[in-house]
Amino acid sequence: MIFIMTDAHAQSAQNIATTYDPTDIERKWYQIWEEKGYFKPSGQGDSFCIMIPPPNVTGSLHMGHGFNNAIMDALTRYNRMMGKNTLWQPGTDHAGIATQMVVERQLAAQNISRHDLGREQFIDKVWEWKEQSGGTITKQIRRLGSSVDWSRERFTMDDGLSNAVKEVFVKLHEDGLIYRGKRLVNWDPKLQTALSDLEVESVEEKGSLWHFKYFFEDKSLKTQDGHDFLVVATTRPETLLGDTAVAVHPEDERYAHLIGKNIVLPITGRLVPIVADEYVEKDFGTGCVKITPAHDFNDYDLGKRHDLPIINIFNKNAEVLAEFEYIAKAGEQISDAIAAPADYVGLERFAARKKLVAQAEAEGWLDQIQPYDLKAPRGDRSGVIVEPLLTDQWYVKIAPLAQPAIEAVQDGRIKFVPEQYTNMYMAWMNNIQDWCISRQLWWGHRIPAWYDAEGNVYVGRNEEEVRAKNNLAADLALQQDEDVLDTWFSSGLWTFSTLGWTGDAKKDAENYFLNTFHPTDVLVTGFDIIFFWVARMIMMTMHFMKNEDGTPQVPFKTVYVHGLVRDGEGQKMSKSKGNVLDPLDLIDGIDLESLVQKRTFGLMNPKQAEKIEKATRKEFPEGINSYGTDAVRFTFCALANTGRDIKFDLKRVEGYRNFCNKIWNATRFVLMNVEGQTVAQEARPELWELPEQWIMSRLQKAEQAVHQAFATYRLDLAAQTIYDFIWNEYCDWYVELTKPVLNDAEVSEERKAEVRRVLLAVMEASLRLAHPLMPYLTEEIWQTLAPMIGKGGDTIMTAKYPVPEAAKMNEQAEADMQWLQGLIGAVRNIRGEMGLGNARLLPVLLQNISDSERTQIERIQPLFKALAKVESITFLAQGEEPPLSSSSVVGHASVFVPMKGLIDPKAELGRLQKDLDKVQKQHDQIASKLANEGFVAKAPAAVVEGEKVKLAEFADQLVKIKQSMEQIAAL
């Protein structure tokens, strides 16, 4: 059955603009999608849920966000089209330290500190800043085409989430899992807050190793080499003032007779013992280590083992205290004060270092100074060296929470993709330490604890509850804890707090969203925050969320871990390197001057600006073109491999922008060839020839491969399959194969109508197949094309995702087509090798062809002739000698193109001789370079390898040119 194209359909080609311009398309469709509510859950089918990893509320989009969002949106759109009740929920993080730093910098520019304003006014300023800049990143997420349900957008400081944070803190405290203690923490003297281990970066730096003489209390004691002192090496001379022991290895015979004896600590005159501990490396330095439990984590642990006192010498600015704080042993409170050496009081730690070394040299107890490569612990935000400092902090007791989280991964309730990250997670979880959750900031969730004048601590959801629970007198003055919670504490509750969890069992049981969408299906994240966030989410969720049978509920079933986006050279993208790319600059384009200004503005080290400007001008002489959202998204998906590093190459974006153009132009061609013509209303497989059988089979295989790719989180394979099918099979082959059919007066109208239907149907299915990866282009074309075959709808977003049909898979058709493609390819290769040009029709001789193959070729002879640009096909008998020809072999078949009369031998030989001379010269230059031992020794290995590859390519070209010359000379 067929139908005549209506007038509306006759306008189809005009509906698609001549050239593909993504800008207008993108703005139009996102607004429609959002206004019509297509991003909201449908309420039908099985649930599918992803929670967006909350970006910093005052931040802006970077390549990692772009990559992450492209993957999440592809997964969401795929599951929505598969009929799932889909929720992709957005939100932002208050980002304690980062946001407070930004606002403090703004105030500093006006010579105002947060202390000048006071806590309440400062927090008001932060909220103002959040309102001003907080929408930037959500606007940018929209530009990426992200189909998140904006009606459910959350912020970690929303009332509901803040109440959930208090509820969790109070319950963990009631369960004995939150405690307050004086412990050693990473203290950031610039930001004036404790940092977790994960917020400290080890930076390789050039330093020194100072060797000092510590003299024995007993003047009669001697070392094996006759000295009355030990030589102790340290990278931190200033902490000498807080030493409480010198440690040696118990099996170090050099010092066995000294264990238990005392040395006199320089400057202070205090006596400190010599202790034996296996922590000491016998072969490092002198084998003697100074122990400062208050200012070194390893020393703190060693001090606990030996019941050493702890002497804190620094205040929170990392300046020497007037009175050192003395603690008899770890875990106890300050019991005494020791007067500091007067000359050192108030000195910043590095000034104290300089003074101490000078004093040691002047007094003769400096032994030597050696250059030393060290790893300096620096705060990841401030960049300053952190100071191990003894402070009162709040901690989560992790061990009881960690065990269920370990078991959930071991028994498969949570699966890591790729699998390799399971081991990374396990290694960390099995060695996990208690979590310091207090931060000395003002912006964030204030710790729900109150103190009376005597230092008693009361924990509760609010002050009223605290007073009622503890029967406190109304006139008893209470002061709330000044600290806030680590940002990762609130984001650790992200999957359930954002769905409205209250901690009230009755309310939570009636919460549709909580019961429908939790546990969520997949968390998409970079490997760099597995510990920061993923592990903590698992622990917190499993403690508070329970299944109906009371067993712990996981936050998500799968953790899809992707690599970090780096530049084309594999370098980390950073402002200081000047290699950062903004996804929106790739989408919209940016001129060179704006790009230079963007990359050089606000550098920590302004001296880098010139170098960055030069590199930018070299790499992007014309600035960056506008590629559109679909090309950028498709690139991200195509790069989503299982490795830890994702090298982002702008050439890939350019290639996928060309892919968008290819789809656009192919659609226009198809529409122009069907408008005003008859198109079959229903499939007529009995009218299919090899091309239709083949393309329909290949479509099923593509659909099958894409489903498998989504199931295994291999979006790179999904992108590759879609690209190969649409470009290489549909556009390059099937569309070309239809041209001679539709232009042939001998072909029946019925068959032509069916070919037009197949052209449209395969493109329509391809658009649905590609939609999760490139939503805008596919929606725009689908709206015009789908109604032409009775498949229209409000939006492609809710159209059914293509599902492979086994009945349409045809292995024989695929094998036959592969063989035909090989024959056509052989003729094209001969044409190219002999420089015959595309305009000339060639005579072709075929040999070693079976009867069935001959029948197949004769049946599709018009297609073969049209695609290979052949004037005649002649079949040679077995053993028949062909005339002098250029030849190729396809399977068992031989393809010949007789050369006589096709070329001017003399002119062609002259041309080839010039090519030969040119290639020979290039070959010899590289061969000479590689024969130079100096070049091979000094050049980077990659450069040498690249030259070897070039040499091999030139050698191959020489062989081919000579073969062509021999063939032509024989004519």
From Swiss-Prot:
Residues 906-933 form a coiled coil. A motif ('KMSKS' region) lies at residues 572-576. Its EC number is 6.1.1.9. A motif ('HIGH' region) lies at residues 55-65. Pfam families: Anticodon_1 (PF08264), tRNA-synt_1 (PF00133), Val_tRNA-synt_C (PF10458). Keywords: Aminoacyl-tRNA synthetase, ATP-binding, Coiled coil, Cytoplasm, Ligase, Nucleotide-binding, Protein biosynthesis. GO terms for biological process: valyl-tRNA aminoacylation. Its main location: cytoplasm. It catalyses: tRNA(Val) + L-valine + ATP = L-valyl-tRNA(Val) + AMP + diphosphate. Monomer. This is Valine--tRNA ligase.
